[in-house]
Amino acid sequence: DTIKRLVEINSKTPNAICCLNGSKPFLKDGYACRYETWRQYKIDTLGQNLIFPCGVGAVLYPPYSLDSLVIKKEEFLTLCPLADDVWFWFCGMLKQTPKHVIYKNHSDYSFDALYQYFHKGSALTHTNRFEHQNDKQIRAIFDFYGVILDNDGNLLSRNEQRINC
């Protein structure tokens, strides 16, 4: 069901990053507020940079949907080694790729989800969300590249000039 839904929605929005679990950050002074305060999308939503495709639940990244920065292994491992979805979100923002959230009102229990249920602490969410590592890694990327977000989700350099991608 998961892959079928992603492929179906991708056929309707072929250039969009499609996900089954997405959230929207609240912003303050150009930076994302704490990850656990972000709003989860509860309806199908098509939008731009302020949609964060969460790796939990599945994400389909079409070819060329991410900036070429995505392959810079050393920067990824330095800035956000525990949060590939944060890295992909940033690379999608640089490319200004639309995001499409397909809301799921039920869960598919994958082997991974069952494993994590019986092995508490094995999922990255325990570190990234509950120990605030997502917040630190998002801030590390934004500080390293000298960018902030405006209220529409556009990346701006710290001197308020829009970044041309």
What is the role of each PLM region?
Residues 2-73:
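Conserved catalytic core of nucleotide-sugar-dependent glycosyltransferases
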Residues 68, 73-165:
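C-terminal catalytic/acceptor-binding lobe
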